């Protein structure tokens, strides 16, 4: 059963009316209601607030990494373990083909349902997950395979065990190694891009965000709690943090924005998956045609960020 957010209530009402019209066999009413639905969707989704975009990024029906992998990756084979400690189910690694092109796909997976969410640790990777991702990146480099990374995490797991096993070192190592991989790398933020947990698989030749995804150094709730000690300031924090694709594109922190279906990826995962696939193929062609892509990646990374000194 579809889940509707509070600002989607009118969409839900019209959808229910369409279903009743179908039961009655009233095709005329169905056609009128569908036109009304399209108009309502365009009206709502063209005027979303940043807080509503955050809600969409976390929508329970939003496609996760495994949904996209199942739809776009053919002849796939999953690879497990980090060769150091364990297999982290919060990060999935596959070898397969996208349009007959052999690729490596690395994704952060949140899981659906209580049992699967626990298995995936709610998409919060441990150090062994990041080391598994690095193992696969080195495999891709050895066999000259492009890499597609799907980012979707609230952040790296903050538990004591993760810290004891070197969470910060694992993330830092990925940043260092992914920056110098000698194969094309393309990363797409499909939902939440939370802090270092997202960055660990977001260093790439091309970094894109889905239209209703977010990318931030901390959750807006965490920011509000730290700066104002007031959870009700979450919407203020969102505006100050500039976490939406549009803001990050303007700041030069991401390369591209991938448009979603009119009702969002959570309403049409097939179209969303196809859009990601086409973006990957286009980006891959662009990178492969550039003999200096490694130098360009380095220059892009070195140009990130700016600061202003004040004499006051």
Swiss-Prot record:
**Places the protein is found:** Cytoplasm
One Pfam family, please name it.
ACCA
Q: Give, as one word, the top-level EC class.
A: transferase
Which reactions is this enzyme annotated as catalysing?
A: N(6)-carboxybiotinyl-L-lysyl-[protein] + acetyl-CoA = N(6)-biotinyl-L-lysyl-[protein] + malonyl-CoA
Annotated metabolic or biological route of this protein? Lipid metabolism; malonyl-CoA biosynthesis; malonyl-CoA from acetyl-CoA: step 1/1
Provide a Gene Ontology MF annotation, just one: carboxyl- or carbamoyltransferase activity
Keyword list, A-Z:
ATP-binding, Cytoplasm, Fatty acid biosynthesis, Fatty acid metabolism, Lipid biosynthesis, Lipid metabolism, Nucleotide-binding, Transferase
Gene Ontology terms: biological process: fatty acid biosynthetic process; malonyl-CoA biosynthetic process
Q: What is its EC number?
A: 2.1.3.15
- Name the GO cellular-component terms: acetyl-CoA carboxylase complex
Has the keyword Transferase been applied to this entry?
yes
Which superkingdom does the taxonomy of this entry point to? Bacteria
Task: Specify the CoA carboxyltransferase C-terminal domain's residue ranges.
Answer: 36-286
Return the similarity comment. Answer: Belongs to the AccA family.
Role of this protein? Component of the acetyl coenzyme A carboxylase (ACC) complex. First, biotin carboxylase catalyzes the carboxylation of biotin on its carrier protein (BCCP) and then the CO(2) group is transferred by the carboxyltransferase to acetyl-CoA to form malonyl-CoA.
Assembly and partners?
Acetyl-CoA carboxylase is a heterohexamer composed of biotin carboxyl carrier protein (AccB), biotin carboxylase (AccC) and two subunits each of ACCase subunit alpha (AccA) and ACCase subunit beta (AccD).
HAMAP family reported in the protein's UniProt record:
AcetylCoA_CT_alpha (MF_00823)
Q: Which PANTHER family match?
A: ACETYL-COENZYME A CARBOXYLASE CARBOXYL TRANSFERASE SUBUNIT ALPHA, ACETYL-COENZYME A CARBOXYLASE CARBOXYL TRANSFERASE SUBUNIT ALPHA, CHLOROPLASTIC
**Protein known as:** Acetyl-coenzyme A carboxylase carboxyl transferase subunit alpha
Organism from which the protein derives: Helicobacter pylori (strain G27)
Lineage here is: Bacteria, Pseudomonadati, Campylobacterota, Epsilonproteobacteria, Campylobacterales
């Amino acid at each position: 059963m579809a889940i509707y957010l509070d600002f989607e209530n009118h969409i839900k009402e019209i959808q229910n009316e369409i279903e009743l019209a179908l039961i009655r066999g009233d095709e005329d009413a169905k056609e009128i209601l569908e036109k009304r639905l399209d108009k309502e969707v365009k009206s709502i989704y063209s005027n979303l607030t940043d807080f509503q975009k955050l809600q969409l990024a976390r929508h329970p029906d939003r496609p996760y990494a495994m949904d996209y992998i199942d739809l776009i990756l053919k002849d796939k084979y999953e690879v497990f373990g980090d060769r150091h400690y364990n297999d982290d189910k919060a990060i999935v690694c596959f070898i397969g083909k996208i349009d007959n092109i052999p690729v490596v796909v690395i994704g952060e997976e949140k899981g659906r349902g209580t049992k699967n969410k626990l298995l995936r640790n709610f998409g919060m990777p441990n150090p062994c997950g990041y080391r598994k991702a690095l193992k696969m990146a080195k495999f891709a480099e050895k066999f000259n395979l492009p890499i597609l990374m799907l980012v979707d995490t609230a952040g790296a797991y903050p538990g004591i065990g993760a810290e004891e096993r070197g969470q910060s070192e694992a993330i830092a190592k990925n940043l260092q190694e992914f920056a110098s991989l000698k194969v094309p790398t393309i990363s797409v933020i499909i939902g939440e891009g939370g802090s270092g947990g997202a960055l660990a698989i977001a260093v790439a030749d091309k970094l894109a965000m889905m239209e209703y995804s977010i990318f931030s150094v901390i959750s807006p709730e965490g920011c509000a709690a730290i700066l104002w000690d007031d959870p009700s300031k979450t919407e203020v924090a969102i505006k100050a943090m500039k976490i939406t694709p549009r803001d990050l594109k303007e700041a030069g922190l991401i390369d591209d924005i991938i448009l979603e279906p009119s009702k969002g990826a959570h309403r049409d995962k097939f179209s969303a998956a196809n859009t990601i696939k086409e973006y990957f193929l286009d980006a891959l062609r662009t990178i492969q045609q550039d003999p200096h892509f490694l130098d360009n990646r380095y220059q892009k990374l070195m140009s990130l960020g700016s600061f202003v000194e004040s004499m006051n």
